[in-house]
Amino acid sequence: MKRPSCRGSSMAIIHDTSDQQEDNMRSYMDGGGAAAYEEEEEEVEDDDGGGGGGGGGGGGGLGEKKRRLAAEQVRALERSFEADNKLDPERKARIARDLRLHPRQVAVWFQNRRARWKTKQIERDFAALRSRHDALRLECDALRRDKDALAAEIADLRDRVDGQMSVKLEAVAADEHQPPPPPPPPPLAYNSKVVDGSTDSDSSAVFNEEASPYSGAAIDHHHHQTPASYDTAGFTSFFAPSTTLTSSLSFPSMFHASSHFDGHQELLVGGGGAGAVADADLGGAGFFAGDEHAGGLSWYGAEGW
């Protein structure tokens, strides 16, 4: 008879404890914060009442009574929980003695408070994870949009490259089908013949210069032939015609003038200095004063006049 009653009393205690924890969790979730802790009603098992009920046995009742914690006791328990959420036997006895509570009441309150603290911690973690998840979702959406934009740009660039390549291939194919250009015409041959590095025009110029009566070779040839005329025909016969006299007088003067100018040029090229330049000037003066110095010439015929 006693065994079923004990089993029923233990089942009733477990059921009451679970109901109390559920009520505490519900009140925490609905109220939230320290104000809810102060206003909530905590019901704990009284060990004295439970022991009396268990000893009575056949009284037919559990003999349990509930006690409500005061607001001051709840605040003191909150301060103790914030200091340390673990409850050892010595600390439990000290808190119970200070607050005039049963040690079992202190243990149940700490147990419920740890459950609420864990629930609140889970809620904070869930809120942090949810905010992070939302941020990641926004970032993922932005990355997806960027990916789509880049894919569209790549497709556009690929189309452009394909179009340019097709145009180039068509141009190359057209160039291959075109016939090659005709070869350039051969260069025209020159009519003038080159003989010993000089053309006919150069040869004719040299020939004309040699044939000219004013060239140096003609004058030199006439100068060398003049003394022979002195010996053969005589002085009077050489100057007999007036035209011959005029021509004979003109050629030596030109010869002397050319010799003076040639000497002047040699002095300037050879670097004879101021004296050489002065002599050259004197030679030039002698050329222009031909009548004064003509008496010194061997062929001058003034005495015969």
Swiss-Prot record:
Q: Where is the signal peptide?
A: none
Q: Where is the composition biased (Acidic residues)?
A: 37-49
Entry keyword annotation includes Nucleotide-binding: no
Record's keyword terms, sorted = DNA-binding, Homeobox, Nucleus, Transcription, Transcription regulation
Q: Name one GO biological process term.
A: positive regulation of DNA-templated transcription
Span list, region Disordered: 1-70, 173-206
Q: Name one GO molecular function term.
A: sequence-specific DNA binding
Segments of this protein annotated with the region Leucine-zipper: 120-164
Q: In which tissues is it expressed?
A: Expressed in seedlings, roots, stems, leaf blades and panicles.
Q: What is this protein's function per UniProt?
A: Probable transcription factor.
Q: What protein family does this chain belong to?
A: Belongs to the HD-ZIP homeobox family. Class I subfamily.
Q: What is this protein identified as?
A: Homeobox-leucine zipper protein HOX8
The organism of origin for this protein: Oryza sativa subsp. japonica
- List the lineage, top down: Eukaryota, Viridiplantae, Streptophyta, Embryophyta, Tracheophyta
